[in-house]
Amino acid sequence: MLGGSSVDGERDTDDDAAGAVAAPPAIDFPAEVSDPKYDESDVPAELQVLKEPLQQPTFPFLVANQLLLVSLLEHLSHVHEPNPLHSKQVFKLLCQTFIKMGLLSSFTCSDEFSSLRLHHNRAITHLMRSAKERVRQDPCQDNSYMQKIRSREIAFEAQTSRYLNEFEELAILGKGGYGRVYKVRNKLDGQHYAIKKILIKSATKTDCMKVLREVKVLAGLQHPNIVGYHTAWIEHVHVVQPQDRVPIQLPSLEVLSEQEGDRDQGGVKDNESSSSIVFAELTPEKEKPFGESEVKNENNNLVSYTANLVVRNSSESESSIELQEDGLTDLSVRPVVRHQLPLGHSSELEGNFTSTDESSEGNLNLLGQTEVRYHLMLHIQMQLCELSLWDWITERNKRSREYVDEAACPYVMASVATKIFQELVEGVFYIHNMGIVHRDLKPRNIFLHGPDQQVKIGDFGLACADIIQNADWTNRNGKGTRTHTSRVGTCLYASPEQLEGSQYDAKSDMYSLGVILLELFQPFGTEMERATVLTGVRTGRIPESLSKRCPVQAKYIQLLTGRNVSQRPSALQLLQSELFQTTGNVNLTLQMKIIEQEKEIEELKKQLSLLSQDRGLKR
């Protein structure tokens, strides 16, 4: 039994008569009595005793703490029950017990977090091994022991990160408001993929449910004009708010700040290109006492903090290593260390993360103050598409400057532009038919794949954008990285209702399609010209040259970019319009109608099934 209770005293006779039996409390606390009254007339106001009893503070649901507890339970199950099948059953029973006691949420015991629990279990195993080795070592340790520990940390880092273990990072493809996309090579099959990293700045139960739900929706999208989805997983990462240089007194070790590490050719990779955990940078000031830390050690075990370390040997050559932090804390903490932190320090279960012991060897002399934030990193593995519609339009515009006669317009290949736009509308029709609104359609999020340049829609904006860290999460100096150009680029394609913050639906995507249609058929000589024309579309102004050259396209640009949402055509209406009325497009239109009719038939079948069930119940 993890907890017990006893009921003392006699029950109220009135309650017995009423037949109401109260459930025994989980813990029997002594009855509260009124506090004795004292004469406080001569006591200063700031020292007066509170008149009301202290209220226990309420803490928000933090997934990180719960995940650590669940991981400990799973680890104990494996230790005490070697049979894998039985250990799973023991783990489930323990989780059910803790859930009933109110110590855990069933959400953190779900299979979606199995990869994170594996990460924690490996960390716990490594911590226990390191702690035992530390206890068995002599107080005075030589460099060989420290190098041995560091080599194990390097190997451990590769084991705990799926991203580092399975993929080789080749290049960064792009960055946006929801994260960064990297070109990687799978070490097993040798194929190239695109992996998008999305840093979740909050990790409450509701937030994680939103992200996981949307990932599952995206996983169900299968269409030739949608970027292919492969898999997704979550890893734990620590994001630091870097300051200046950190001196850490370890034999043959020197810790550099992120800024110095970037300048060093042999330095550590940028934080955004690695799932490893990075310890905070501190200010090189004289040692002084600091306030107590808010970091709590949940499992009362040895905490191995990480740092970006540059090893300097006798020849002054440098090699880069990274150490993992195995301790987990709240999602947003500000650790401040007093005096010196021994490597073997173990914080108290309920106490603050401080060190008062002195150690002559192997001490970490941490100076300054920093902020370490604990987040979850969502990784989405997708089909690799390197050429975007933005690249295609930019190259087309460069070629257009060679021609003076705009009426001839040889650089605008109407057939190619029509093909691109038709495939784009087909992809939008599919996602709208699935009940999904893209919200961020623009040339940078549309890709051309393969020799035939097949259109692929990607970079779906997560509807839970308020819990996704913006593009500044990789910024070194803590300042915003978004430029004026990037904001303009987003606003040019966003519908008026999106910019006004009002409710929007699939018709907002149709506005973006109207702007893209204009850009496909209207080359621009400069960025200023492009911004002026695309901004003028909001007020119904379309270039006269485009209206003369492409009257049908100009007509639908006017309809799609209209301020009246109800008058904008849908994706299906566009596919059935005169924009694509060729022999092949007629067949496509008929296929789209069949899809719509089949959907209606399925809905009618469901309604008939419900009606028949109701009649059966009435009989």
From Swiss-Prot:
Reactions it catalyzes? L-seryl-[protein] + ATP = O-phospho-L-seryl-[protein] + ADP + H(+); L-threonyl-[protein] + ATP = O-phospho-L-threonyl-[protein] + ADP + H(+)
Positions of region (Disordered):
1-40
The molecule here is called: Eukaryotic translation initiation factor 2-alpha kinase 1
Give binding positions for ATP: 173-181, 196
Q: Which organism is it from?
A: Mus musculus (Mouse)
Q: Which parts are the HRM repeats?
A: 408-413, 549-554
Q: Where is this motif: SIFI-degron?
A: 85-104
- Give the classification, highest ranks: Eukaryota, Metazoa, Chordata, Craniata, Vertebrata
Report the Pfam families cross-referenced here. HRI2_3H (PF22949), Pkinase (PF00069)
Q: What is the effect of changing residue 490 to D?
A: Almost complete loss of kinase activity; even upon arsenite treatment
Per the record, the major location class is cytoplasm
